[in-house]
Amino acid sequence: MKFFEFSQNNSGGHFDVDDKVTHRVLIEAENAGEAIEIAESLGMYWNGCDEGMDCPCCGDRWYTPWSNDGKVFPFAYGRFGEKEANSICENYGAELKKRDKESIGGLEWDVLFKTPEEYMQYLADAYGWTKPDGYIYYKDGRKVSIYSKKVK
């Protein structure tokens, strides 16, 4: 089972937030097609500019993931310097992992998030704009709301 991430573009200068969608949504599904079907049932759409719902200058609010975009946890995220990677690991219970590939500019560390909640909490705190900032939809029907510690 994989998790597919849908990150909302603030088309028109605002995010749509309700009890189904928010800034970032993570959906557990067998494949991208199933995740897209679930996303559409939550109110996401893919043609907002063409349909006149989204700002043509800002772009579409939502984009579909690629078929190979699914995340499996534990999930290695990053390309950080060692100090920043260590700080993230300490704050979110993640693990430090040296990159297997060549580093770029000394950014040779990944952060290994063990759970979707750890990953989404990090993203909410690092890039959060909304309350809540993330929803996680599990295949078993559970929904978890993620709140940024920085958004009041």
Question: What is the meaning of each model-derived region?
Answer:
Residues 1-22:
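Short aromatic-glycine-(Arg/Gly/Cys) micro-motifs in beta-strand/loop hairpins
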Residues 41-152:
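Short, mixed-charge low-complexity intrinsically disordered segments
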Residues 3, 26-28, 143:
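A generic structural signal for ordered secondary structure
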Residues 16-43:
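Short, flexible N-terminal segments of the mature chain
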